[in-house]
Amino acid sequence: MMMNHSIVFIDEGHSFIFSREFADVIEETDNYYVLISRRALTCLPYSIHEIYGIRTSGRYHFPEKIYHEFYPIYKEDEWQNIESPVLFITEDSKSGYQFVKECCDEKAICMSAEGNSDIYELLKKQSNGQKTVVLADGAVFGAYIGKILVYAKVKKNLMLYLPESFEWIILKSGVLSSKKLEDILAHPEMYIDSKEYFSWERFYTDYLEKMTANDKIRKYKK
């Protein structure tokens, strides 16, 4: 019997949580899932802001966000008066990549990793002194953030920009405006149905496309 409208807890002792089949099944449900694991769940699109560690205080155990705040992992003076081109790596090859590429000047290079899972491998191929900025959708980057942060602390030449999604940036920019949009951006959890949207990134994309559908100039298509 399929559960509905439930909060489901599963720990890593059940290895199926790492499978594509599990991801496909839960995508069709309206439940919320709390998955307890020390390994990344690469088959699932989860947010960098929804990763928790279990903190112990005496007899009590409680969850605590791990990536609730990003501290600078570079020195400001290292990013001033840059002579060599800065490399921008985007997760996607569509609208986000196209936007960044258009914004790049002669001192910048833009590359697409063609997916979240390939960002780390692309970073390893760059020269040690290459100043690099990684742009990815924070709403679905949870499985990869740990490895990237470890790499960043070692290399000291990497900046991370991880907004919810590229579509979220557009909605947040002020190009479009409405009272409902303001409320959605302030309280997304009140509007995003987990059965209809497997990730918040999908919701923002769908909402932006619907909001601009009848606008010949600003019509958005991912």
Locate the predicted segments by residue.
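Short glycine-rich substrate-engagement loop in P-loop NTPases that contacts/grips substrate
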Residues: 1-3
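Small-side-chain structural scaffolding
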Residues: 37, 48-49, 134
